[in-house]
Amino acid sequence: MAGAEQSQRWSLKAKTVLVTGGTKGIGHAIVEEFAGFGAVIHTCARNEYELNECLSKWQKKGFQVTGSVCDASLRPEREKLMQTVSSMFGGKLDILINNLGAIRSKPTLDYTAEDFSFHISTNLESAYHLSQLAHPLLKASGCGNIIFMSSIAGVVSASVGSIYSATKGALNQLARNLACEWASDGIRANAVAPAVIATPLAEAVYDDEFKKVVISRKPLGRFGEPEEVSSLVAFLCMPAASYITGQTICVDGGLTVNGFSYQPQG
């Protein structure tokens, strides 16, 4: 394979990308990953100060990143966001990264109706609706990609809350459905399911005992880093991954494949 062709297979240069929740944790790493490959990115966040701080840093790095203040859990704001993206990118979008997510970890019997609505609107409805809104833009690009940021909690039972887990499982199924339904439109869809990653969200939600137990179950014996997730997200959107669609790929240090035979190293 010629060098130029090889390089093109592993390129995201000039690709247009929308990343929701791109100012923190995995979302922040995804923005920087794609920007490092030469993509043109628009991201959104609720906190205007944090967004502007990130945009300023990215500008200094020479990244092509713009941003909107937006609560993507709200339908009118999602519609406004997609109008902005459509105008900015000339009615086309190459890549949609549905990264927005939130968690309230409780026993099932302690969840309220408001907790249920919160998780559904933030984790599931936002991704579902944004995918609907993005469809004509992705189709117009001729080679669209959708990534749903899921969780291993949507693959196996995890003590992080049944509603959160249900929304992540739904995202995995949504990736499968859209992969089949929209394949004829030139759109691929995949889900990426991390385990506990070293992010501010993980620090805020999980106590030390929980973290210790999780690490003890991981054959690699540590938490993952955001960049170890963003690298997979970038790969899935490259021409090199053109035959991968409808998949849920775990990024978990081996956690989901660890049965009873493995004993963590002391």
From Swiss-Prot:
UniProt binding sites for substrate: 151
Keyword Chloroplast included in the entry's annotation: no
Binding, NADP(+): 18-42
Top-level taxon: Eukaryota
Pfam families: adh_short_C2
A molecular function GO annotation: oxidoreductase activity
Keywords per UniProt: NADP, Oxidoreductase
InterPro entries given in the database record: NAD(P)-bd_dom_sf, Sc_DH/Rdtase_CS, SDR_fam, TR
Enzyme Commission number, as recorded: 1.1.1.-
Enzyme class, spelled out: oxidoreductase
Protein name per Swiss-Prot or TrEMBL: Tropinone reductase homolog At1g07440
Organism of derivation: Arabidopsis thaliana (Mouse-ear cress)
